[in-house]
Amino acid sequence: MKPGFSPRGGGFGGRGGFGDRGGRGGGRGGRGGFGGGRGGFGGGGRGRGGGGGGFRGRGGGGGRGGGFQSGGGRGRGGGRGGKRGNQSGKNVMVEPHRHEGVFICRGKEDALVTKNLVPGESVYGEKRVSISEGDDKIEYRAWNPFRSKLAAAILGGVDQIHIKPGAKVLYLGAASGTTVSHVSDIVGPDGLVYAVEFSHRSGRDLINLAKKRTNIIPVIEDARHPHKYRMLIAMVDVIFADVAQPDQTRIVALNAHTFLRNGGHFVISIKANCIDSTASAEAVFASEVKKMQQENMKPQEQLTLEPYERDHAVVVGVYRPPPKAKN
């Protein structure tokens, strides 16, 4: 193998032929090969350091192999660039989405974002973007539709999510709080999110999240028994449910009867496999909608979550709608 040509994918990081350990650069970044590469000249100096960085989103990429000092500084960095993403907000515009409290970040790649309620804090390693507006800097957090059913529904074009600034939301099946954190961003300091989760392990993460976000109230209880936590929760405007249980419509109905105001709304994420793995997804969705109608819950729209989730649908509707005035 010729000096200075490392194998694709970096094999050994390509130690760059002679150059004084030049480049072990590339390293974790996948494209390894480039790192080592140019080592050969001048004591390895310009080994084009941590290659990788670029891949995981414009992040801190380890500069150019530690400047010129000989030895090439092993091209630090690259590695975990991704976190801060297009931090500086150069060439990035943020515009409001038609759902109040949700925004679209337009840059090299468009992304769904929410305004960070706790600037400087990342909840689950998501990218953050700071935009200067006058003298203020506003920080936004990227919202990944592959990790959040609500984000998938919004990108899928759902007509209404009913979660908006100032709303009081009951979130069933909060898990570790990935989506809850974004709902907390949307409702803002004047809103509230009651996050119900049965698993104690996820509940720990949820409680830690609530320490920093004062509008989240964690409830570590089984959503099947709303009477156990009825003293903690006031009437709410919206119920969002992602419980993935065979009797999930019944669970949502029990909570709606207890906490949801008349004319309030619900957003339910349905995973067909969890309810009946033998029937087709469409049949499962249809039967769940029927059950909702029997519980005074009037579905208004249904949307599948392709391409983000398989055999998932979101149903949005209204609870006990007020009777229409007759003319």
From Swiss-Prot:
Enzyme class: transferase
PTM statement from Swiss-Prot or TrEMBL: Ubiquitinated. Ubiquitination leads to proteasomal degradation. Deubiquitinated by USP36.
Summary of subunit composition and partner proteins: Component of box C/D small nucleolar ribonucleoprotein (snoRNP) particles that contain SNU13, FBL, NOP5 and NOP56, plus a guide RNA. It is associated with the U3, U8, U13, X and Y small nuclear RNAs. Component of several ribosomal and nucleolar protein complexes. Part of the small subunit (SSU) processome, composed of more than 70 proteins and the RNA chaperone small nucleolar RNA (snoRNA) U3. Interacts with PRMT5 and UTP20. Interacts with DDX5 and C1QBP. Interacts with NOL11. Interacts with PIH1D1. Interacts with RRP1B. Interacts with NOLC1. Interacts with SDE2. Interacts with NOP2 and NOP56.
One cellular-component annotation, GO: nucleolus
PANTHER family listed in its UniProt record: RRNA 2'-O-METHYLTRANSFERASE FIBRILLARIN (PTHR10335:SF4), RRNA 2-O-METHYLTRANSFERASE FIBRILLARIN (PTHR10335)
Annotated binding of S-adenosyl-L-methionine, by residue: T178, T179, E197, F198, D222, A223, D242, V243, A244, Q245
Residue positions, PTM N6-acetyllysine: K108, K127, K211, K212
Catalytic activity: L-glutaminyl-[histone H2A] + S-adenosyl-L-methionine = N(5)-methyl-L-glutaminyl-[histone H2A] + S-adenosyl-L-homocysteine + H(+); a ribonucleotide in rRNA + S-adenosyl-L-methionine = a 2'-O-methylribonucleotide in rRNA + S-adenosyl-L-homocysteine + H(+); a ribonucleotide in U6 snRNA + S-adenosyl-L-methionine = a 2'-O-methylribonucleotide in U6 snRNA + S-adenosyl-L-homocysteine + H(+)
Gene symbol of the encoding locus: Fbl
Record-given protein name: rRNA 2'-O-methyltransferase fibrillarin
Membrane-spanning residues: none
Keyword vocabulary terms for this entry: Acetylation, Isopeptide bond, Methylation, Methyltransferase, Nucleus, Phosphoprotein, Ribonucleoprotein, RNA-binding, rRNA processing, S-adenosyl-L-methionine, Transferase, Ubl conjugation
Modification type Phosphoserine: residues: S122, S130, S132
Biological process terms in GO annotation: box C/D sno(s)RNA 3'-end processing; ribosomal small subunit biogenesis; rRNA methylation; sno(s)RNA metabolic process; snoRNA localization
Residues the record lists as Asymmetric dimethylarginine modifications: R8, R15, R21, R24, R28, R31
Stated family: Belongs to the methyltransferase superfamily. Fibrillarin family.
InterPro entries: Fibrillarin, Fibrillarin_CS, SAM-dependent_MTases_sf
Statement: the UniProt record of this protein carries the keyword S-adenosyl-L-methionine: yes
Role, per record: S-adenosyl-L-methionine-dependent methyltransferase that has the ability to methylate both RNAs and proteins. Involved in pre-rRNA processing by catalyzing the site-specific 2'-hydroxyl methylation of ribose moieties in pre-ribosomal RNA. Site specificity is provided by a guide RNA that base pairs with the substrate. Methylation occurs at a characteristic distance from the sequence involved in base pairing with the guide RNA. Probably catalyzes 2'-O-methylation of U6 snRNAs in box C/D RNP complexes. U6 snRNA 2'-O-methylation is required for mRNA splicing fidelity.
Biased amino acid composition, Gly residues: 7-80
